[in-house]
Each structure stands twice: as structure tokens, then as C-alpha cells.
């Protein structure tokens, strides 16, 4: 699904450039679209504790440059962070629809690449991605990426109202 979302974006950029692009250029396009987004929301600090399957997130985010301290509970670090964002950072409600993660190389110091697809309250499915040597932070950064992408992508047009049927006079 991520390929279906990124493909048209990459094709538009290739068309704009008017030439084929290298693998490095394609990767740079991906990073610009998914990894490097810090507006309108950026992660400033993140901490999570868990006891008996309940996790509490304490974090601070920058919303359009203003620091906002957030706190939330959930059944895992991602759920706790989502709860905190929605309840304390003026972020529109959303749910996590898909979560995937992979290592970028071998070894204990390898960076993790996390992919998260969110479903917004207006039924859009938006992907985000995050990279960090800490797998939890990679996931949190992916949430931020998806939220930022959702904030900058227009909502689908409203459906037109159904036609009104007026009976003809007899």
C-alpha cells in the first residue's frame, strides 16, 4: 500500500524533472516526503513506562513551533503516544491502521525503519515513516510523519447531497 501512495508522488517528481532518476534520488524523494517532515508537528522529548500491559507516555512535541507537553495511556508505546497526541496536542482523531518495521542493516547498532499507516476521522489512509536506532522512537517518528502528512494533504471533497425529488403536480 505504501508503494501505491509513494509511486504517484515519485512519478510526478520524475515528470517535473523530465528525466530518469537514480536510486539515490528516489531515496531522497522518499526521505523528503516521509522521514524529514517536521511541520506542523515535531517530536521534542519522548518517554514511556509500562506496567502490566498498560503503558504511559510522557512527551513534548512542537506544534507549529510551540512546545506542548502531552501524556497518555495505551496498551503499548504507540497507542499511548497516539492517545497523548489526540487528547493534548490539538491533533485530529486518528487510528493506527497498519504498522511495519524493518532493520536497515545488521547488528545491535542498526537503525530501524518504521512504517505506520493512519486512518483519519475523515476516512483517509495516510502513511508515515520514521528512522532511529531505537525501535520505539522509529515508530513514534513514523506516527509524527503520518500526522504531518495528513495535515498537509487535503481532505477528499465532500460528497454532493443526494438529488431532491419533488413530485410533479397532478
Name these PLM-found stretches.
Residues 1-170:
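Terminal or standalone catalytic/regulatory effector modules within metabolic enzymes
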Amino acid at each position: 500500500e505504501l508503494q501505491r501512495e509513494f509511486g504517484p508522488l515519485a512519478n510526478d517528481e520524475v515528470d517535473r524533472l523530465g528525466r530518469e532518476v537514480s536510486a539515490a534520488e528516489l531515496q531522497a524523494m522518499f526521505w523528503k516526503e516521509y522521514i524529514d517532515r517536521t511541520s506542523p508537528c515535531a517530536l521534542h522529548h519522548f518517554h514511556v513506562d509500562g506496567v502490566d500491559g498498560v503503558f504511559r507516555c510522557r512527551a513534548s512535541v512542537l506544534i507549529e513551533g510551540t512546545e506542548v507537553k502531552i501524556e497518555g495511556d495505551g496498551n503499548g508505546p504507540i497507542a499511548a503516544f497516539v492517545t497523548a497526541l489526540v487528547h493534548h496536542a490539538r491533533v485530529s482523531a486518528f487510528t493506527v491502521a497498519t504498522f511495519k518495521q524493518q532493520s536497515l542493516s545488521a547488528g545491535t547498532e542498526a537503525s530501524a525503519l518504521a512504517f505506520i499507516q493512519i486512518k483519519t476521522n475523515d476516512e483517509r489512509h495516510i502513511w508515515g515513516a520514521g528512522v532511529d536506532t531505537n525501535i520505539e522512537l522509529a515508530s513514534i517518528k513514523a506516527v509524527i510523519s503520518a500526522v504531518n502528512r495528513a495535515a498537509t494533504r487535503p481532505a477528499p471533497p465532500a460528497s454532493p447531497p443526494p438529488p431532491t425529488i419533488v413530485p410533479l403536480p397532478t
